[in-house]
Amino acid sequence: ILRCLVGSEMCIRDSNADNSSQAESMVDESGIDESLTDSSVTHDDADDLSDAVFIGDSRTVGLQNNCDKPKATFLCSVGMHIDTVMTDQNITLSNGNAGTVIDALGERQYGRVYINLGTNELGWPYIDTFKDYYTQLITKIQEIQPDAVIYAESILPVTASRSLQGDAINNTNVATFNQAISEVAQQTGINYLDCTSAVAGADGTLPEEASSDGIHLMSEYCDKWLNYIIDNT
């Protein structure tokens, strides 16, 4: 089941079944590619992801919209933050009521849990605070999903032009926060999944053609991202 809040509307779709307000608005108001469904990248059909759940912000919403994996579960929302992911009631539960990501995770057991959070937090001044909230989330997931393999994904890079705009959404901050995520993964005993190479060019940045706003991925690059996840987990 896809359960997500896109924009201001709660939604549930059958799929089997930021602390800087400036940074947040720049990520969330930029739009998600939902129209480019054709892709030159072949979908990896060997894994239907029926045992997988994806937790994340608008980039994960974009992944769901373009990945053609109807049996995967997506618990995602535009503007999802690490400090409120466990308390915001922005997920539609199986009974139709609004609930948290944690509530939704309690409805069934998964084999794999993928977390992609941090883009909206790139403006946070205190990296230790980010790490504390990330650790709390992982600890709670481990409690609710004791048999699941948990993957903390890296924050994907942004384009070079987006990185040079002079705000918090830049690749220097991406690298800093990814180091923090890697450290949290090691400390909590989960897996750190560096997806950068799946979408980055030779210079380590997101290619300009990969995104209409420098942040959110076009369909082809969503396929590259998902194929990397499938091939490496």
Q: What is the meaning of each model-derived region?
A:
Residues 1-14:
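Single conserved hydrophobic/aromatic residue that forms the stacking wall/gate
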Residues 13-31, 35, 39-42:
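Intrinsically disordered, low-complexity serine/threonine-rich repeat tracts
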Residues 42, 46-133:
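Conserved SGNH/GDSL esterase-like catalytic core that processes O-acyl groups on lipids
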Residues 105, 141-143, 185:
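N-terminal cationic-hydrophobic initiation segments that often serve targeting/anchoring roles
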Residues 116, 153-154:
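Alpha/beta-hydrolase-fold catalytic nucleophile elbow
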Residues 134-138, 178:
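Generic structural signal for well-ordered alpha-helices
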Residues 145-149:
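A short helix->loop->beta-strand "cap" motif at the edges of active sites that frequently abuts
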Residues 158-233:
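Catalytic His-Asp segment of secreted/periplasmic serine-dependent ester chemistry enzymes
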